[in-house]
Each structure stands twice: as structure tokens, then as C-alpha cells.
Amino acid sequence: MIVKYVQPDRSGIQAHNFTRHSIGYVVRGKKCVYYGDVCHEIPQGTLFYMGMGNHYTEDVPEQGKNFEQIVFYYTSDQLSRILNHLSVGYQLNITNDHSCPNCENQSHVSYPASNIMKNFFGTVNQYLKDDAFSQDNTAETIKMTELIYLILAQKDCC
């Protein structure tokens, strides 16, 4: 599922219980993720991942402009199918050798989006405006596959 969220006003910290994983992009404003008293800011132009479970977040609009984000929600099964397709269909060598304390100890990860990612989310934004995904699961799966490929193809951010 691909969704665009637009938040015109600051509404404070909200609790979310995600039943799916999510990869998102902050189009405008900033997102704050809270762990106890610690706030992690995710600024405009940043890609983020949030795992399943409870999250405490706040979406902060820019001065006079809406907060905007685009989020891809997916299950572990969907990700498995996409990774299998990329591995078998395109002989992509997929490994999980990334390891750093920042990524392992949190249920979210964020990093600045590359120009390719910004262009990708710009295209997705236009597709959402044109309502291209509402009745077309194939288009949504293709975009999700493209997103996963782009993430795998870039260098580690840490």
C-alpha cells in the first residue's frame, strides 16, 4: 500500500501501532520519532524505515506549509517475494552484511535521500495525484520493487 499523508497543523506526539513495515520519504516539514525522552528528527528530503510495533511520532509542518510524507507499507511476505524476484529474475546478489549500532538498536532508521530517490518519490507523488494506484495492485508492486532495488543498489549510509 502506498499512501501520501498531508498534515496542515502540528498535532503533537501520536502513538502508532504498525502491523506492517514501512519505508517513507519526508516531502516537506520534519518527522520526529521518540524513544522515551529522546527525539530523533527526520528532516525534509530524508528516507526512513519503521518496523512493525509501537512508535511515537510527531509530524511538524514547515512554516505556513503542510507536512507531507509518502509511505510504502508492506508485509514480510511481500518483501520476501520482491527480494526473490530481484535475485532470481535479475541475478541480483542480495546480502545482509550491514551492521552498526545505530541501525540495530532502534526500530526506525533514516538517512538523507539521494537525488535518484528524490526523483523516484517525485514520480510516486505524481502517480498518487493521478490516482494511479487505487485500483492497480500491479503498478503498486512494480513501484515497491523499484524502491527496494534502489535501496539495495545504493551504498550504506552509516
Locations of regions flagged by a protein language model:
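An amphipathic alpha-helical interaction segment
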Residues: 103-158
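Short intrinsically disordered, low-complexity coil segments enriched in acidic
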Residues: 1-2, 145
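N-terminal regulatory/effector-sensing and dimerization cores
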Residues: 2-99, 133
